[in-house]
Amino acid sequence: MFLNKIQQRKSGVLLYGITPPKSQTPPEKVVEIAQRTLERLHNLDIDALVVYDVQDESARTTEERPFPFVTALDPFEFSVNHLHTLKISKIIYRPAGKFTKDELAAWLDGLHKHNFYPVFVGVPAPDFKVKTSLTEAYQIWSKNKGTSVIGAVTIPERHAVLKDEDIRIMDKMNSGVSFFVSQCVFDVDFAKKVIEDLSASCIMHGKELPTIIFTITACGSIKTLEFMEWLGIHIPDPLKSELKASENILAKSLEVCIEIAAELIKYCSSKSVPFGFNVESVAIRKEEIEASIFLTNKIGSMLKEAGIRK
């Protein structure tokens, strides 16, 4: 059970991440998409399903977005209305700053009623007028801390520049956050540096390490590669060249993802860090969706072989 694993700081947590259908999708098509999603997930050995809140981040950069932004259905409503037969925990993302305190309180009550767990994220642009701060949002959630858990995001790329991700994580831990889901990892050294510095900071301050969940995503095309970079995901130049030169970029990226997972399993185990993985499936191409299922099963097997996942 996801809640118990996070509360007990058990390693081997395995998540699968999706985005809801586009908001202009006809209702009958939404039902069809949800049914296909359920068919894929019912036999998948995962602890929880992550449902992302899709935001337009164009304002944070002057670079042109490789794919046009399209709004998506509300992740909580999509989960409640269409994914209720999937009897696993749901983790719902939400940008806290876009909502008032009353709106967030009502939303959190709805999540708690359904045994869903929130992950609060920042607003899509630096100049966005914030209605509720993250600190305030965590305070609103805190009434449920005895029977729930709350997550946040961690961005290894940010740590590579600002060198303060360990401090950011510890600040959120002080607000009750017990698990952190990373941005997609393609630079394993960036991810390991966050763990190294966080581990040192926790030891220094006498705190237990939180659960770190690494997001892993296969890349099926050059366009997707460009989009990942636009999102701020760092792909080392040698790896980027290797992927671009590959005859089958999807197959090559799967190899890379498995190598990254193996290295992180070994590293986190050596550091006694509670950890897990979140395999993203945000593409619409059948091949990429099937690749995400393969990757989830593969990483699950790797965790079991290492004696980490039961």
Features from the language model and the residues they span:
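Glycine-rich phosphate-binding active-site loops on the catalytic face of alpha/beta enzymes
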Residues: 118-126, 174-190, 240, 277-284
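Short, conserved beta-strand edge motifs with alternating hydrophobic and charged residues
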Residues: 153, 181-183, 211-217, 280
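Glycine-enriched alpha-helix->loop->beta-strand junction motifs that scaffold or abut catalytic
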Residues: 45, 86-88, 112-117, 145-147, ...
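Conserved, mostly hydrophobic/aromatic
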Residues: 17, 49, 111, 172, ...
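Short acidic, glycine/proline-enriched helix-loop-strand junctions
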Residues: 134, 139-141, 193-213
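Catalytic-face loop-and-helix region of soluble metabolic enzyme cores
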Residues: 207-274
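Active-site beta->alpha loop and helix N-cap motifs at the rims of alpha/beta catalytic domains
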Residues: 2-163, 244-248, 252, 282-310
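Ligand/cofactor pocket segment of small-molecule handling proteins
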Residues: 146-187
